Amino acid sequence: TVDKFGEENIELINQKASAGYANSYSDFEFIENLPKFQLPFLHFTGTHRAFEIKGDSMLPLTSGSIVIGKFIENFDFLKDGKTYVILTKEDGIVYKRIEVLNNSIKLISDNKTYDPYNIDKSDVIEIWEAIAFFSHDFPNPENEYKNIKNHINNLYSNLDELKNKL
């Protein structure tokens, strides 16, 4: 939607509204009643929406983070490896990294404890390319370094066990 000055609004689909969005994404009255905001420091063209994500499948983005997406009108504009907010008939709103296949799209979580899965292109209702995000959780690089160090130590332990068996 556009404000009285002709500036593009960004509608927010929060977790509460996300359940109704799958059925009302094209309902002007539903969209009109969503919370709206503008970001003067983001200069963009096109239609944008903000989605509050839930779950831990896209860590380090945490549940409650807001992803701003630009509407993508055609599958030809999708780029492998980029992240998108996708509205599907089956799963509703999902936020994933993608790989475009012939008749389907592979959805890939950044959190590797979740397996990738494919959806048919015919199941896709809307696609929004992620262009920015806001989070209430600030990154803690110390935790990331500890995580990497633990993985490396585990690999060394596994190598030592293999050497001892040989």
Language model segments and positions:
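C-terminal regulatory/effector modules of DNA-binding transcriptional regulators
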Residues: F77-G81, V85-L166
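Feature for secretory/organellar precursors and membrane-associated catalytic proteins
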Residues: N23-S24, L39-I108, T113
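Short, positionally conserved secondary-structure boundary motifs
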Residues: T1-S63, F134-L166
